[in-house]
């Protein structure tokens, strides 16, 4: 998927016309196992890059989801409150967590592209 950027903590950020969509990668959801609860950020929250923005809980563990870039939360995926398993079923699609405006789009340049992320996964898998 073009323009998607990744963190070493397995979050992705996908620019779109309204801002950028944030979620966790397929690798992350597979490591977590069955997701049973998601705590989403508050709309209007201003996040710094690297700050914890959400929490995902699975049958194995709870993990923070950090903001890959600075910005204001403009939308959350409320479907995850009713069906947190969407994170497992479609992490790059309907399992997204939140959308934010980008305070500084150049922050994305410091993140990995898909090729670099795939290489990174191979070093830890």
From Swiss-Prot:
Transmembrane segments: none
Keyword Acyltransferase: no
Cofactor binding note from Swiss-Prot or TrEMBL: Binds 1 lipoyl cofactor covalently.
Domain of life where this protein originates: Bacteria
Modified residues (N6-lipoyllysine): 60
Pfam families, alphabetized: GCV_H (PF01597)
A single Gene Ontology CC term: cytosol
Tagged with keyword Mitochondrion: no
Alphabetic keyword roster: Lipoyl
Its job: The glycine cleavage system catalyzes the degradation of glycine. The H protein shuttles the methylamine group of glycine from the P protein to the T protein.
Protein name: Glycine cleavage system H protein
């Amino acid at each position: 998927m073009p323009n998607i950027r990744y963190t070493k903590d397995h979050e992705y950020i996908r620019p779109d016309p309204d801002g950028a969509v944030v979620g966790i990668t397929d690798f992350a959801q597979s490591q977590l196992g069955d997701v049973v609860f998601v705590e989403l950020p508050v709309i209007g929250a201003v996040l710094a890059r690297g700050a914890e923005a959400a929490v995902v809980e699975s049958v194995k563990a709870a993990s923070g989801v950090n903001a890959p870039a600075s910005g204001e939360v403009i939308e959350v995926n409320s479907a995850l409150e009713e069906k947190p398993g969407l994170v497992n079923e479609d992490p790059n699609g309907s399992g997204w967590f939140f959308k934010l405006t980008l305070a500084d789009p150049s922050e994305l340049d410091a993140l990995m592209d898909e090729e670099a992320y795939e290489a990174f996964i191979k070093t830890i898998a």
